[in-house]
Protein backbone atom coordinates (compact mmCIF):
# COMPACT_ATOMS: atom_id res chain seq x y z
CA UNK A 1 0.00 0.00 0.00
CA UNK A 2 1.15 3.52 -0.75
CA UNK A 3 -0.55 6.71 0.43
CA UNK A 4 0.27 9.93 -1.39
CA UNK A 5 -0.69 12.80 0.85
CA UNK A 6 -2.14 15.99 -0.67
CA UNK A 7 0.87 16.57 -2.89
CA UNK A 8 -0.80 17.05 -6.26
CA UNK A 9 0.74 19.89 -8.21
CA UNK A 10 -1.57 21.64 -10.66
CA UNK A 11 -0.18 22.01 -14.17
CA UNK A 12 -1.40 24.35 -16.89
CA UNK A 13 -2.66 22.49 -19.96
CA UNK A 14 -0.20 23.05 -22.83
CA UNK A 15 -1.35 25.39 -25.61
CA UNK A 16 -0.48 22.70 -28.18
CA UNK A 17 -3.22 20.46 -26.74
CA UNK A 18 -5.82 22.92 -25.44
CA UNK A 19 -7.67 26.13 -26.31
CA UNK A 20 -8.40 28.37 -23.31
CA UNK A 21 -7.62 27.92 -19.63
CA UNK A 22 -7.13 24.28 -18.64
CA UNK A 23 -5.60 23.04 -15.38
CA UNK A 24 -4.56 19.44 -14.77
CA UNK A 25 -4.09 17.59 -11.48
CA UNK A 26 -2.43 14.19 -12.00
CA UNK A 27 -4.25 11.58 -9.89
CA UNK A 28 -2.50 8.37 -11.03
CA UNK A 29 0.54 7.88 -13.23
CA UNK A 30 1.88 4.68 -14.77
CA UNK A 31 4.24 2.89 -12.39
CA UNK A 32 5.34 -0.58 -11.37
CA UNK A 33 3.84 -2.37 -14.34
CA UNK A 34 0.58 -0.41 -14.37
CA UNK A 35 -0.33 1.57 -17.48
CA UNK A 36 -3.17 3.51 -15.82
CA UNK A 37 -3.10 7.29 -16.11
CA UNK A 38 -5.79 9.44 -14.48
CA UNK A 39 -6.12 13.20 -14.10
CA UNK A 40 -8.66 15.68 -12.81
CA UNK A 41 -8.94 18.26 -15.58
CA UNK A 42 -10.47 21.69 -14.94
CA UNK A 43 -11.72 23.72 -17.94
CA UNK A 44 -12.61 27.42 -17.81
CA UNK A 45 -15.70 28.49 -19.83
CA UNK A 46 -15.07 27.86 -23.52
CA UNK A 47 -11.85 25.92 -22.95
CA UNK A 48 -11.44 22.63 -24.78
CA UNK A 49 -9.02 19.98 -25.96
CA UNK A 50 -7.68 19.76 -29.47
CA UNK A 51 -8.83 16.83 -31.60
CA UNK A 52 -7.06 13.73 -30.31
CA UNK A 53 -7.13 9.94 -30.01
CA UNK A 54 -6.09 7.43 -27.35
CA UNK A 55 -4.44 4.11 -28.26
CA UNK A 56 -6.47 2.21 -25.66
CA UNK A 57 -9.53 4.47 -25.40
CA UNK A 58 -10.45 7.01 -22.74
CA UNK A 59 -13.12 7.36 -20.09
CA UNK A 60 -14.08 10.78 -18.77
CA UNK A 61 -16.33 11.24 -15.73
CA UNK A 62 -17.81 14.72 -15.31
CA UNK A 63 -17.64 15.85 -11.67
CA UNK A 64 -18.59 19.55 -11.91
CA UNK A 65 -20.07 22.04 -14.34
CA UNK A 66 -21.35 21.58 -17.87
CA UNK A 67 -19.24 20.32 -20.73
CA UNK A 68 -19.31 19.38 -24.38
CA UNK A 69 -17.84 16.45 -26.26
CA UNK A 70 -17.79 15.27 -29.85
CA UNK A 71 -16.36 12.42 -31.87
CA UNK A 72 -15.24 13.28 -35.40
CA UNK A 73 -18.29 13.35 -37.68
CA UNK A 74 -20.79 13.10 -34.83
CA UNK A 75 -22.99 15.62 -33.03
CA UNK A 76 -21.73 17.73 -30.14
CA UNK A 77 -23.16 16.36 -26.90
CA UNK A 78 -23.76 18.23 -23.65
CA UNK A 79 -22.33 16.43 -20.61
CA UNK A 80 -23.15 17.07 -16.94
CA UNK A 81 -21.99 15.92 -13.49
CA UNK A 82 -22.25 12.15 -13.15
CA UNK A 83 -22.06 11.54 -16.92
CA UNK A 84 -19.39 9.11 -18.09
CA UNK A 85 -18.15 9.09 -21.68
CA UNK A 86 -16.03 6.33 -23.22
CA UNK A 87 -14.10 7.10 -26.39
CA UNK A 88 -13.09 3.98 -28.31
CA UNK A 89 -9.40 3.29 -29.06
CA UNK A 90 -8.35 5.47 -31.98
CA UNK A 91 -11.64 7.42 -32.02
CA UNK A 92 -10.86 11.07 -32.82
CA UNK A 93 -12.66 13.39 -30.40
CA UNK A 94 -12.55 16.50 -28.25
CA UNK A 95 -14.10 17.59 -24.96
CA UNK A 96 -14.24 20.75 -22.89
CA UNK A 97 -16.39 23.28 -21.06
CA UNK A 98 -19.57 24.88 -22.35
CA UNK A 99 -19.17 28.52 -23.43
CA UNK A 100 -20.70 29.90 -20.24
CA UNK A 101 -19.77 27.22 -17.68
CA UNK A 102 -16.74 25.75 -15.97
CA UNK A 103 -16.34 21.97 -16.23
CA UNK A 104 -14.20 19.42 -14.40
CA UNK A 105 -13.81 15.79 -15.34
CA UNK A 106 -11.67 12.87 -14.31
CA UNK A 107 -9.90 11.46 -17.38
CA UNK A 108 -8.77 7.82 -17.29
CA UNK A 109 -6.58 6.18 -19.94
CA UNK A 110 -4.28 3.21 -20.34
CA UNK A 111 -1.04 4.33 -21.96
CA UNK A 112 0.45 2.30 -24.82
CA UNK A 113 3.62 0.19 -24.62
CA UNK A 114 5.78 3.30 -25.10
CA UNK A 115 3.95 5.22 -22.36
CA UNK A 116 1.94 7.47 -24.71
CA UNK A 117 -1.56 8.34 -23.51
CA UNK A 118 -2.71 10.28 -26.60
CA UNK A 119 -1.98 11.45 -30.12
CA UNK A 120 -2.84 15.11 -30.60
CA UNK A 121 -4.23 16.72 -33.75
CA UNK A 122 -5.54 20.11 -34.84
CA UNK A 123 -7.25 22.53 -32.51
CA UNK A 124 -11.05 22.56 -32.55
CA UNK A 125 -11.88 25.70 -34.53
CA UNK A 126 -14.15 28.40 -33.17
CA UNK A 127 -16.62 27.49 -35.94
CA UNK A 128 -16.65 23.82 -34.92
CA UNK A 129 -17.08 24.77 -31.26
CA UNK A 130 -19.87 27.27 -32.06
CA UNK A 131 -21.95 24.43 -33.55
CA UNK A 132 -22.65 23.17 -30.00
CA UNK A 133 -26.23 23.19 -28.72
CA UNK A 134 -27.14 26.10 -26.45
CA UNK A 135 -26.47 25.49 -22.76
CA UNK A 136 -28.60 27.36 -20.25
CA UNK A 137 -26.43 29.19 -17.81
Give, region by region, the residue ranges found by the protein language model.
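A short, N-terminal "cap"/entry segment at the start of jelly-roll beta-barrel domains
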Residues: 1-36, 117-137
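Conserved strand-loop elements at the edges of beta-sheets that form or border functional pockets
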Residues: 29, 53, 61, 81, ...
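Short, conserved beta-strand element in jelly-roll/cupin
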Residues: 40-44, 53-69, 108-111
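Short beta-strand His + acidic residue motifs that chelate non-heme Fe in jelly-roll/DSBH
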Residues: 49-51, 69-70, 87, 92-99
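A short hydrophobic beta-strand segment most commonly corresponding to one strand
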Residues: 59, 86, 100-119
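Short acidic-glycine-tyrosine-enriched beta hairpin
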Residues: 73-90
Amino acid sequence: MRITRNSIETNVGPAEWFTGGVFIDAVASPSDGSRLHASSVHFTPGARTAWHTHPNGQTIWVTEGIGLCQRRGGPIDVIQPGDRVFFEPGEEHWHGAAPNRFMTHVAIVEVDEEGNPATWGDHVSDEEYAAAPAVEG
